[in-house]
Amino acid sequence: MPESQDIISQSIPSLTQFLGEEQARFPNIPTAIPIIIQAMATSARFISKAVVQSMIDKDVSFTESLNCSGDTQQKLDIVAQSFFLEALEATHEVCAVISEEADSVVPLRNKNARYIVALDPLDGSSNINVNSPIGTLFSIYQRISPSETPIQDADVLIPGKQQLAAGYMLYSTVNTLVYATIYGVHGFTYDPTVNQFFLTHPALRMPENGITYAINHSYLHTFPHYIQNYIAYCRRQELTSRYTGALVADFHRHLLEGGIYLYPPTYKRPKGKLRLMFECNVLAFIAEQAGGLATDGKQPILNIIPRHIHQCVPFYIGSKTMVKNLLNCVG
């Protein structure tokens, strides 16, 4: 390693160091939280390598199965879930996982553990074969029922405002980890030369306004009229449209630079497409801790009580001023 790079790495806290320091500053954070976040970060390194290897082996292929949301699964969706399940079980802090790629709750062998993780193992996996960004989303809940008993619906069907922490990994030109607790939002960048994440974006705050919006324009004619009116407003304001097809990537841009992401209901999907528990709650928690807003058009995302773990909702998230302007169009 060049000497200058070594000096830089030594002067910036690693994820491990920062989690320890944050635990010391805020003793109310359960000791399990940094352990779980560290396990997610470790798994992300392996997943990044698996994605690269799949490209080299030209094995970016789909399975013959659909997940519960009706999306065709790629092999890497299943591989990623396996990595995370193994890592989370090894923490001894997680009793169960709910995943976009699993039909129902996945119990782990840690019967005495008090925490449940909601997980989207590989967001935007259809982007892999064209080398576009992909991501992972996760959040942490505390179970309600007693330890050593089967997981109950009440343990998982709870509003997102009860999340203890939430985060995502973005696999792109550099690999990034962002996580949030009630004490703030922080971003880390992966340095492959030392195999660690380093704090590069401390105490993130989402700008109150922005100049970009993200929406799939190909469905514009199927959106409700109020969304069509809002898009017309964005165009009159000469806002820039940026849409990658990977939720994590689009949100990350808006977290850093300001903007709004929209996934409205359509004729074919009147209840929306994005999963409340695996995608919307995760990013809504991060956005609100960073000063942004997230809504389904009627109520804050974090207030919604899920009916089932794979529930879908309309989703609007981003800079506070832009989301409020959208809600004015909804009326």
Swiss-Prot record:
Molecular functions (GO terms): fructose 1,6-bisphosphate 1-phosphatase activity; magnesium ion binding
The protein's enzyme class: hydrolase
Cofactor(s) recorded in Swiss-Prot or TrEMBL: Mg(2+)
Organism superkingdom: Bacteria
Pfam families recorded: FBPase (PF00316), FBPase_C (PF18913)
EC number(s) on file: 3.1.3.11
Binding-site positions, substrate: 123-126, 216, 243, 261-263, 273
Family matches, as InterPro entries: FBPase_C_dom, FBPase_class-1, FBPase_N, FBPtase
Disulfide bonds listed in the record: none
Entry keywords, A to Z: Carbohydrate metabolism, Cytoplasm, Hydrolase, Magnesium, Metal-binding
CDD domains named in the record: FBPase
Gene Ontology BP, a term: gluconeogenesis
Reactions listed under catalytic activity: beta-D-fructose 1,6-bisphosphate + H2O = beta-D-fructose 6-phosphate + phosphate
Residues given in the record as Mg(2+) 1 binding sites: 100, 120, 122
GO cellular component, one term: cytosol
Pathway in which the depicted protein is active: Carbohydrate biosynthesis; gluconeogenesis
Cofactor comment text: Binds 2 magnesium ions per subunit.
Positions bound to Mg(2+) 2: 120, 123, 279
Family: Belongs to the FBPase class 1 family.
Complex formation: Homotetramer.
Protein name per UniProt: Fructose-1,6-bisphosphatase class 1
